């Protein structure tokens, strides 16, 4: 019992701190809207406002556009700043991982659909981590629709999109399936 006491105290402290922890309150000045990119699929789009050329932030896997809440407003001094939460995450729609729903080209098409719906012309796209493949998909297929691409920590296969070897579709489908399993209360042990 003498050795268990410190562990019990530590466990109690962790539980107590968990009870005290609250969901962070987003106090950044932005508008939230939902853009329908295809039937039954709506994406959450944050608009931090600003003047100047458009700048669109795309978060990495598992994140939402709210990842950029801390610093996006600083860019609004020189740009009109947006953030898109990709399908399958956050408040955006969560379609089943089938029929290429999570391929790089499909995710890139979602970005283009948001741009079209909001009349955003030639933005600079800024993508973190796996969003690099979305950027590469858009930039390689429609270079005339973007003013530039900025890769943040995207030095993986995701940033080097090659339509002949679409890694992202398989990986995103697997990630989505596993997230759905966890949320349903079970995890596949494979």
What are these model-derived regions, one by one?
Residues 69, 112, 136-140:
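Short, hydrophobic alpha-helix immediately C-terminal to the catalytic nucleophile
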Residues 80, 121-163:
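Conserved hydrolase catalytic core segment
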Residues 23-42:
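N-terminal cap/lid segment of alpha/beta-hydrolase-fold proteins
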Residues 7-18:
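Bacterial N-terminal signal peptides
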Residues 38, 46, 86-126, 130, ...:
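Active-site loop/oxyanion-hole signature of alpha/beta-hydrolase fold enzymes
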Residues 41, 46-94:
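Conserved HGGG/HGGXW glycine-rich cap/lid loop of the alpha/beta-hydrolase fold
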Residues 40, 49-52, 77, 116-122, ...:
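Active-site acidic short loop of glycosyltransferases
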Residues 150-185:
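Flexible "cap/lid" loop of the alpha/beta hydrolase fold
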